[in-house]
Amino acid sequence: MDSTTLQQLEEILEQKIPPIGPKGHNIGVWYPRKEREVFKDLCYSATKLLLPLYPIYIPSKGRFKSRLTSRVLERLGVPYYMVVEPQEYEDYARVIDPAKILKLPFSNLGQGSIPARNWIFRHSLEKGHAKHWILDDNIRYLLRRNNGVKVRCETVNVFRAAEDYAARYENVAMAGFNYQQFAINYEIVPPVRLNTRVYSCILVDNLLAAQVLDNGQLWRGKYNEDTDLSLRCLKAGLCTLLFNAFLIMKGATMKMKGGNTEEVYENGAKRKDFAESLAQQHPDVTKVVQRFSRWHHQVDYRPFAGNALIPCPSIVPSTPNNYAMFLDELTPQRYKEMLCRDGCK
């Protein structure tokens, strides 16, 4: 668009159009102009509880004191399994109902969460589940993004909404919630992004994911396991869904005790290994770059843009469904609970 046309468009819209960024991104504008609303004193609640259709697993290590994701799910009243190594079972059982804890048959393998993730996959298959959720253990709270604004979400109904959306299509191998920092308020962000990486809060289709097993294992390697699995599914012609309508706020992996920090991210030198491992697994779409004095992997997802969703017949509803969610008052007590940090009571 030339400068004259841009100026004419800005006059019609009665607002400035932000310049396009270095990656071709544009934050966009709202027309009519959207006034910035403040929702800091509100949260999403629900008039009724809609539990997830599929089990939620949380592989965890060394975080029985913080147990952030567990706290969130407890507060929202949703069942889950905390998956732990045997030497830490008693620590977790002192703070979590033992009926919610699954004890792994191994410990300290030095492979991060990979063995636990593969055990979880097999467990869900043995229990006859078509899909399962697998969540990182450092999720602080959930959010819903609607009309360009993120609001904290105090209902588990977003899991059911995501499940139902994924069920509209026959070939969605992975779906999940994006990180809240990647869906900025008032920027033009699609509610769902197709065919990209999904991590930290994932709904896995067991049957479809089984198409990409490597030596009988779903998860592999030591680093970047979520991105690796996303790429393997995409290379198999399957699709992934990343929700911007539903988001998670996480604690920083490197700043929290426990988890895979000691086994996988134990020092800065590991950063290059972390980046190079994905480039070795997927050299056709990955390169290693240095940003902000740290090594990163950079993945090109454009080759998978042609992976088309296959709709299931007669499954898309004809009317909107808010899954019983509504904007509610965010009380000081609720706010305190949502921001509960490591070791809080």
Language-model-detected regions and their locations in the chain:
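Short, polar loop motifs at secondary-structure junctions
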Residues: 62-63, 84-90, 207-208
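Conserved catalytic core of nucleotide-sugar-dependent glycosyltransferases
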Residues: 141-231, 235
